[in-house]
Amino acid sequence: MSVEYINPSTSAPPRGYSHVVKHGNTVYIAGQVARDRDGKTVGVGDAKAQVDQVFKNLEAALAAAGGNLSHIVKTNIFMTHREDLAAYREVRAKYMSNDNPPVSTLILCSGLADPDFRIEIEAIAIVP
């Protein structure tokens, strides 16, 4: 089985990593942050705007691998502000069903790669 490295044109070009690696039906998605396709941070200081951009980036990553958000089986969420949990849950509900949610780990941390980032989500998906 070959390994495919994918960097969607709708995402900011990565430096030193791939946004998506697909091996067979398994898709590994690098931590997605609130950057648009031009590399600009979206929603500085605005948790909802940042979570929304992260889910848009996850959608783009999965689409590039032939999948969608319903194919996610595992997420790791890194957040810098505990008070952003409600905003995260609210925005996540717009993108993901609660019928069969993926397994998930949420980690509160003191910071991410850019001090303006409030959230980062990495995922594993199984696509048909």
Q: What residues fall within each predicted segment?
A:
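N-terminal presequence-like segments and the immediate start of the first folded domain
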Residues: M1-K56, A60-V73, M79-P128
